[in-house]
């Protein structure tokens, strides 16, 4: 029971990180019907910017962890927002209206470009970050085994819940959210009604990139290391989470992230850590076969 409980805590933490990345995928898909396959690299860049930010805070003598985290978070979100806007402006907008494979190929090319750019700039070796927040709370002990939740795990889950609620409110109750929903329903009609479609899509990419930055910083703090390749695997798992939950649905993206986290952690804990990725991606195949719209997704209605 103690071992199971500890793995459950670890799984929820990892699932929260995947869920934050998955929301970026699902927001973009919900409006333009395309997958931003460079989103994983934005997450990776957010982690690297966070690493640089923590190094700057250390150099400036900022020893307060909350202050350093807040400053680094704002810095990472600002930088990745620029990357998100640039990706939309260069890889998607010029190809809007072309055949559907064109933006997909362009996004994959952008992903490879960003990955190699970071590799050349930061090197291929993993970069350690050290411990940012230490300590935790022991929930209970049994059979000589302590079930602990780290303060960082609590922070990750709380931040994820707050951001999930905040973005849901933005989409449901703000002018930008109404414009996003209008573009999702019918982009041409939204433009005729006065919605600035280009601006709305760009802001959606910016919002998704900012969430990826938060996930990148949480990943860096949780695992204490970052390299140029983390965006590829984490991005694929987050995409799997978005499809599993129902791509286009924010609650579905978070649910999918939690499920992927549970599958990955419990498979590694009870079976083999070597095949945890196989187990996670097998879920994608099964979902596409038996429920293509995902757990919370709505079936698409084609107009004729």
List the predicted regions and their residue ranges:
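Hydrophobic core segments of alpha-helical transmembrane domains in multi-pass membrane transport
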Residues: 47-52, 73-83, 108-118, 157-168, ...
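Single transmembrane alpha-helix segments in multi-pass membrane proteins
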Residues: 4-54, 86-102, 244-250
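Alpha-helical transmembrane segments within multi-pass membrane transporters and channels
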Residues: 60-110, 117, 255-260, 291-292
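Transmembrane alpha-helical segments in multi-pass inner-membrane proteins
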Residues: 18, 69-74, 78, 205-212, ...
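Pore- or pathway-lining transmembrane helices of multi-pass membrane proteins that form conduits
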Residues: 41-45, 94-119, 231-243, 259, ...
């Amino acid at each position: 029971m103690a071992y199971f409980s500890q793995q459950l805590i670890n799984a929820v933490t990892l699932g929260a990180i995947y869920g934050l990345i998955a929301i970026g995928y699902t927001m973009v898909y919900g409006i333009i019907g395309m997958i931003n396959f460079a989103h994983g690299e934005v997450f990776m860049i957010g982690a690297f910017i966070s690493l640089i930010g923590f190094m700057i805070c250390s150099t400036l003598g900022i020893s307060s962890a909350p202050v350093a985290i807040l400053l680094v978070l704002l810095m990472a979100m600002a930088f990745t927002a620029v990357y998100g806007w640039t990706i939309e402006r260069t890889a998607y907008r010029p190809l809007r209206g072309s055949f559907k494979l064109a933006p997909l190929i362009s996004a994959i090319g952008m992903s490879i470009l960003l990955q190699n750019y970071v590799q050349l700039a930061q090197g291929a070796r993993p970069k350690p970050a050290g411990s940012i927040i230490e300590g935790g709370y022991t929930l209970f002990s049994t059979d000589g085994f302590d079930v602990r939740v780290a303060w960082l795990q609590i922070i990750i889950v709380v931040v994820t819940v707050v951001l999930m609620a905040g973005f849901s409110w933005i989409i449901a109750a703000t002018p930008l959210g109404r414009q996003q929903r209008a573009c999702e329903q019918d982009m041409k009609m939204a433009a005729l009604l006065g919605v600035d479609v280009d601006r709305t899509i760009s802001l959606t990419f910016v919002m998704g990139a900012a969430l990826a930055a938060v996930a990148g910083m949480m990943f860096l703090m949780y695992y204490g290391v970052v390299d140029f390749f983390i965006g590829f695997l984490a991005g694929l798992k987050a995409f799997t989470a978005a499809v599993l939950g129902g791509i286009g649905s924010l609650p579905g993206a978070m649910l999918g992230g939690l499920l992927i986290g549970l599958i990955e952690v419990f498979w590694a804990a009870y079976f083999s850590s070597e095949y945890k990725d196989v187990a996670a991606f097998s879920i994608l195949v099964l979902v596409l076969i038996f429920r293509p719209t995902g757990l919370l997704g709505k079936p698409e209605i084609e107009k004729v």
